[in-house]
Amino acid sequence: MFRDFCKERLKRAKAKNKVRDKLACKLLFWKLKDYQNILLYSPLGHELDIRPLIFRLRQKNKRVWLPKSIKKGANFSKEGFTIAPFRLPLKRLGWFDEPSLSRCYKRELDCIVVPILGMDTSFRRVGFGLGMYDRSLPKLLKKQLKRPLIVFVSRELAIANSILTNAYDIEANLYMNARIVMKNDKRKHYEQRVNLHFIRSFGSVFDHRSSHVLCDEKDLLR
């Protein structure tokens, strides 16, 4: 299964590559700096570490939201989440924790950044199979007049060569990591661009059979 392949790939990946994560955060910042209400996530060990991005956006007075588990009795539900504003200190589980709920008015989200295992050719998310984002986002966005920008992120890109997802699975506008940005263009399937800053930093060699377009970071997100 594609999901199992992605999980095995995660186990083999170098989870401590801080340089790549910082490059990805820098690229994400260029995209998100014009948005005001942004839903991010609390990164797990296998996910792209976006903590530097969260703090940088807060320094720019952006309203950052994080998922907040819904408590059912003595336990937390695995079926969905609500959102809460990012605030310091976050001490319950150590250095980085879920935010606490507040009466802060939930404004309409402008942008949502979603961690993924992989995606298929319809630009829909393949996650861990719990369906938390698929259940939660429609409820959060139900009363919004405008659909927010949805950005998929991961350390390494994995794309299935066929459609594996369902119509209710999340579809993104963009995919981003330290190396590339892919735009979901329904007319041309997708466009892909390579981050020149990454090439300069790592001296990487790419497969040009996929018609990569080389460009600098500021031009990458046009």
Q: What do the PLM-derived regions correspond to, one by one?
A:
Residues 1-103, 107:
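N-terminal active-site beta-alpha-beta segment that forms phosphate/nucleotide-binding
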Residues 6, 64, 113, 129, ...:
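Residue-level signal for inorganic ion chemistry
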Residues 42, 116, 179:
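Glycine-rich, N-terminal phosphate-binding loop of Rossmann-like dinucleotide-binding domains
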Residues 44-46, 117-121:
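Short glycine-rich anion-binding loops that position phosphate/pyrophosphate groups of nucleotides
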Residues 55, 128-134:
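Charged helix-capping and loop-helix junction motifs
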Residues 103, 107-112, 121-124, 135-222:
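Surface-exposed, charge/polar-rich loops and edge strands
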